[in-house]
Amino acid sequence: ETLKRFFPEAKVFTTDMNPRLAPAAYVSDGCFEVLRVTDPNYIQQILKLCKDNEIGMIIPTIDTELLVLAENKKLFDDNNIFVSVTSLDFIRVCRDKRNTGEFFEKHGIRVPKPIDKKHPTFPLFAKPYDGSLSTNLHYIKNEEELTTEILEDPKLLFMEYIDKEVYKEYTVDMYYGKDNKVKCIVPRERIKIRAGEINKGLTEKEPLTQYLYDRLETIEGCVGCICIQVF
């Protein structure tokens, strides 16, 4: 509705592997069936759809699309199609939680302390460095729960457990312009979670808005929306 208000002739198209089951397909101006994002022909298919339908901008909405679109951004630029995606380097920071922790510490934001899995202290928390949707997460209260399977998982990071009964948990949406400067910060308390996504929340301005603005006013290579979870 906002787009139509400023650009009455504009159209919004969507894509999905199964348009018949995609809610956005029923409200957009058209929905195209596409390959899985990992398919080697995905990019060429998206490029052809853009050319055939005079689409000038691509806005990805799930994190699995970001890397492949960033890797092919020049291809779309050469065809006068703008991809609203951050730089490849910053996406690598976000997609690998080992890099994410270093990024936050560099900007003066504390992260959970790492724990040596060979000499653990309890309780602890383990999660994959490339995980999403709250999969393969482990809250471990004692040595008996620290199984061999968990210890031998090469993707798991081990860290101190942050108790949600003690600390409030927030999801913060931040929007960055083409100048890599933040334009909007919206913190929401995570009251109820489903599959890693906030299902019920409460928007609160302070104290996070100023705290994050002071530390993340500018992020090199960051364009569009990012999402941060903090306690």
Regions found by a protein language model. Give the residues of each.
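Conserved residues at the C-terminal ends of beta-strands
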Residues: 34, 61, 117, 188, ...
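ATP-grasp fold ATP-binding core
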Residues: 104, 111-116, 120-139, 154-165, ...
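Short loop/helix-cap segments at secondary-structure boundaries that form the rim of catalytic
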Residues: 20-28, 117-122, 148-152
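Phosphate-binding site of ATP-dependent enzymes
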Residues: 141-222, 231
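Glycine-/Pro-rich loop/turn segments that contact NAD(P) or position catalytic residues
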Residues: 77, 81, 88-113
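ATP-binding N-terminal substructure of ATP-dependent carboxylate-amine bond-forming enzymes
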Residues: 1-84
